[in-house]
């Protein structure tokens, strides 16, 4: 599911989203970005 990483990945205030990226990649997505402190996976 596209937002499966939202609760599992930290999104810091200053663009720290490696954890989000890794989670999304592991879930089979093309990375991810942080939007309002929440991790959103790319399609």
From Swiss-Prot:
<keyword id="KW-0964">Secreted</keyword>
<feature type="disulfide bond">
    <location>
        <begin position="11"/>
        <end position="34"/>
    </location>
</feature>
<protein>
    <recommendedName>
        <fullName>Potassium channel toxin gamma-KTx 4.2</fullName>
    </recommendedName>
</protein>
<keyword id="KW-0800">Toxin</keyword>
<keyword id="KW-0872">Ion channel impairing toxin</keyword>
<dbReference type="GO" id="GO:0019870">
    <property type="term" value="F:potassium channel inhibitor activity"/>
</dbReference>
<dbReference type="GO" id="GO:0090729">
    <property type="term" value="F:toxin activity"/>
</dbReference>
<keyword id="KW-1220">Voltage-gated potassium channel impairing toxin</keyword>
<keyword id="KW-0960">Knottin</keyword>
<feature type="disulfide bond">
    <location>
        <begin position="20"/>
        <end position="39"/>
    </location>
</feature>
<dbReference type="InterPro" id="IPR036574">
    <property type="entry name" value="Scorpion_toxin-like_sf"/>
</dbReference>
<feature type="disulfide bond">
    <location>
        <begin position="5"/>
        <end position="23"/>
    </location>
</feature>
<comment type="similarity">
    <text>Belongs to the ergtoxin family. Gamma-KTx 4 subfamily.</text>
</comment>
<keyword id="KW-1015">Disulfide bond</keyword>
<keyword id="KW-0632">Potassium channel impairing toxin</keyword>
<comment type="function">
    <text>Reversibly blocks Kv11/ERG potassium channels.</text>
</comment>
<keyword id="KW-0528">Neurotoxin</keyword>
<dbReference type="InterPro" id="IPR012622">
    <property type="entry name" value="Ergtoxin"/>
</dbReference>
<dbReference type="GO" id="GO:0005576">
    <property type="term" value="C:extracellular region"/>
</dbReference>
<feature type="disulfide bond">
    <location>
        <begin position="24"/>
        <end position="41"/>
    </location>
</feature>
<dbReference type="Pfam" id="PF08086">
    <property type="entry name" value="Toxin_17"/>
</dbReference>
């Amino acid at each position: 599911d596209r937002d499966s990483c939202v609760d599992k990945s930290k999104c810091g205030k200053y663009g720290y989203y490696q954890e989000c990226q890794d989670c999304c990649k592991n879930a089979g997505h093309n990375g991810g970005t942080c939007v309002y402190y929440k991790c959103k996976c790319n399609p």
